Amino acid sequence: MNIIQDFVPAGRRNRPGKPNPMKYITIHNTGNASKGAGAKAHAAYIKGDAAANVPASWHYSVDDSNIYQHLPDNETAWHATDGNGPGNSQSIAIEICMNSDSDLLKATDNAAGLAASLCKKYGIPVENVVQHNEWYPKKNCPQMIREGKPYDWGVFRGRVLQFFQG
């Protein structure tokens, strides 16, 4: 699994720099179906001026062919809509790209593989791979998975387990 490290500069509002004990992995969909809105585009956005003063960040952007890492895993990200709660302060955030010119099945499988790899690396139980909705029930995220596209949450967790055991 090739991960392109392209970190948000230290000291910016969207890189809080607080320690993250890495107890969970939170799965998101980007909410951006625009053509070209893959992992590279999201990497450019999160590092760009438009996001510099926005309290929103995540660790990984995943599409059908690339994985970009934006923050070190052991740093907090602002992604779970729970303030200083465990979603933000204790989890690694994975954003699955849903751009219309991408293979959503491949992107979602790539995210499941990444989640499994992170579970192994940090001793995170597969049961602690959760939806954004877990931290903020009003948020329909990961939207595509919650709608069964390309498959539902049970299948996603099963794919994480398959990659973990494989």
Across the structure, where does each feature detected by a protein language model lie?
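N-terminal catalytic cores of peptidoglycan-degrading enzymes
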Residues: 1-87, 149
